[in-house]
Amino acid sequence: MPNPAELAAHHWGFAAFLLGVVGLLAFMLGVSALLGSKAFGRSKNEPFESGIVPTGGARLRLSAKFYLVAMLFVIFDVEALFLFAWSVSVRESGWAGLIEATIFIAILLAGLVYLWRIGALDWAPESRRKRQAKLKQ
């Protein structure tokens, strides 16, 4: 086990980096506190609305569909990254890599078909979809 003097000699660069980060952080916070505006008033607590008088509350309830679409996007986006990594190394991976990528794509498509079949990708309720289908006829 190295003694403390050897550790200090070995990690002096990291310690200097941390000291620089803390110093820069203190400098930026100090300058912003000195130069920043200190105006307090009733209008300070109101949200900025581009010159439009705000109406109603600032809290807006979003449908759970937005969160579902966001999660599906993240999942399929990460899977697209895996496919991109495979496409970069397709020559090195050979036939085994092609078979694995084909299985991976098949699993992706099965997941997409499953989500489609259970209605996870439908934005409108079923009653509204039936009503719109009748209107199109």
UniProtKB/Swiss-Prot annotation:
Pfam families documented for this protein: Oxidored_q4 (PF00507)
PANTHER family according to UniProt: NADH-QUINONE OXIDOREDUCTASE SUBUNIT A (PTHR11058:SF21), NADH-UBIQUINONE OXIDOREDUCTASE CHAIN 3 (PTHR11058)
Protein name (database record): NADH-quinone oxidoreductase subunit A 1
Source organism of this protein record: Pseudomonas paraeruginosa (strain DSM 24068 / PA7) (Pseudomonas aeruginosa (strain PA7))
Catalytic activity from the UniProt record: a quinone + NADH + 5 H(+)(in) = a quinol + NAD(+) + 4 H(+)(out)
Homology family: Belongs to the complex I subunit 3 family.
Keywords: Cell inner membrane, Cell membrane, Membrane, NAD, Quinone, Translocase, Transmembrane, Transmembrane helix, Transport, Ubiquinone
GO MF annotation terms: NADH dehydrogenase (ubiquinone) activity; NADH:ubiquinone reductase (non-electrogenic) activity; quinone binding
Major subcellular site: membrane
